[in-house]
């Protein structure tokens, strides 16, 4: 669990965590609980002793045999547990699924082998909630896969190339969140008033064709005098 997430969880359950603590964590490199203890200048011996006294009080309050056995098991588990170490921001091996869309989007009647490969990606947590582990150097790596098509109920093997993205270096970068733009109702109305509105009227005109008819033949008649 990242340290900042743990502090937010504790703050939600009990007293609020002061912002000064987040600022202290952002300016130092904390890799273990000892580093955190030295940074906060707090001795954990008294806390461990108080925890042991609390366990002993609970042991005597109930049934002595069952409570004492549970207390011994809890003390044994605490002694055997190793100290937690922060997951540093660095490259790690992850599994990348090769989908069929990366090879051919027009055809779905084929299989890809291998269906997944290993890539190097940045992961880990940073000491401040305002920074994230991101890649600072990236390399594109082409790999060759098999495209298995089914033609007339028989497999046909073809070769295809897929480009993978590997992360070579990582660092904790500041996360820039875009601020939402809030507009008042009056501003939107003024913007609409300033914007010229043009209306286009389209008229449909029907052209009437003359009726089809036979050509009449006119006979020339001489004028009688």
Swiss-Prot record:
Q: Which GO terms describe its biological process?
A: actin cytoskeleton organization; angiogenesis; blood vessel development; blood vessel morphogenesis; branching involved in salivary gland morphogenesis; cell chemotaxis; cell migration; cell projection assembly
User: What are the glycosylated positions?
Assistant: 55
Q: Which residues form the propeptide?
A: 13-73, 183-225
Check the record and name the SUPFAM superfamilies matching this protein: Cystine-knot cytokines
Please give an example of a GO cellular component term from this record: platelet-derived growth factor complex
According to UniProt, residues marked as the site described as Involved in receptor binding are 100, 103
Q: In which tissues is it expressed?
A: Expressed in a distinct subpopulation of smooth muscle cells in injured arteries.
**Which pairs of Cys residues are joined through disulfide bonds in the record?**
89-133, 122-170, 126-172
Question: What GO molecular function annotation could you give as one example from this UniProt entry?
Answer: signaling receptor binding
Q: Which SMART domains match?
A: PDGF (SM00141)
Segments passing through the bilayer: none
- The keyword Glycoprotein belongs to this UniProt entry's keyword annotation: yes
What's the chief localization of this chain?
secreted
- First and last residue of the signal peptide: 1-12
Family per UniProt? Belongs to the PDGF/VEGF growth factor family.
Its assembly, as annotated, is: Antiparallel homodimer; disulfide-linked. Antiparallel heterodimer with PDGFA; disulfide-linked. The PDGFB homodimer interacts with PDGFRA and PDGFRB homodimers, and with heterodimers formed by PDGFRA and PDGFRB. The heterodimer composed of PDGFA and PDGFB interacts with PDGFRB homodimers, and with heterodimers formed by PDGFRA and PDGFRB. Interacts with XLKD1. Interacts with LRP1. Interacts with SORL1 (via the N-terminal ectodomain). Interacts with CD82; this interaction inhibits PDGFB-mediated signaling pathway.
Instruction: Please give the function described in this protein's UniProt entry.
Output: Growth factor that plays an essential role in the regulation of embryonic development, cell proliferation, cell migration, survival and chemotaxis. Potent mitogen for cells of mesenchymal origin. Required for normal proliferation and recruitment of pericytes and vascular smooth muscle cells in the central nervous system, skin, lung, heart and placenta. Required for normal blood vessel development, and for normal development of kidney glomeruli. Plays an important role in wound healing. Signaling is modulated by the formation of heterodimers with PDGFA.
Record-given protein name? Platelet-derived growth factor subunit B
Q: Which gene encodes it?
A: Pdgfb
């Amino acid at each position: 669990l990242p340290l900042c997430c743990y502090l937010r969880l504790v703050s939600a359950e009990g007293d609020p965590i002061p912002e000064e603590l987040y600022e202290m964590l952002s300016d130092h490199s904390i890799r273990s609980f000892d580093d955190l203890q030295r940074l906060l200048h707090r001795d954990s011996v008294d806390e461990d002793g108080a925890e042991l006294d609390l366990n002993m009080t609970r042991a005597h309050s109930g049934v002595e045999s069952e409570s004492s056995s549970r207390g011994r098991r809890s003390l044994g588990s605490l002694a055997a547990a190793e100290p937690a170490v922060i997951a540093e921001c660095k490259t790690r091996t992850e599994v990348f699924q090769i989908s069929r869309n990366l090879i051919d989007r027009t055809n779905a009647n084929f299989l890809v082998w291998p269906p997944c490969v290993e890539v190097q990606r940045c992961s880990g947590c940073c000491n401040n909630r305002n920074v994230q582990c991101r890649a600072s150097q990236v390399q594109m790596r082409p790999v060759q896969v098999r495209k298995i098509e089914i033609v007339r109920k028989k497999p046909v093997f073809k070769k295809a190339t897929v480009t993978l993205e590997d992360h070579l270096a990582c660092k904790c970068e500041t996360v820039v969140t875009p601020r939402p733009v809030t507009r008042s109702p009056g501003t939107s109305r003024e913007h609409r008033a300033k914007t010229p509105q043009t209306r286009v009227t389209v008229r449909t005109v029907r052209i009437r064709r003359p009726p089809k008819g036979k050509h009449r033949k006119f006979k020339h008649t001489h004028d009688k005098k």
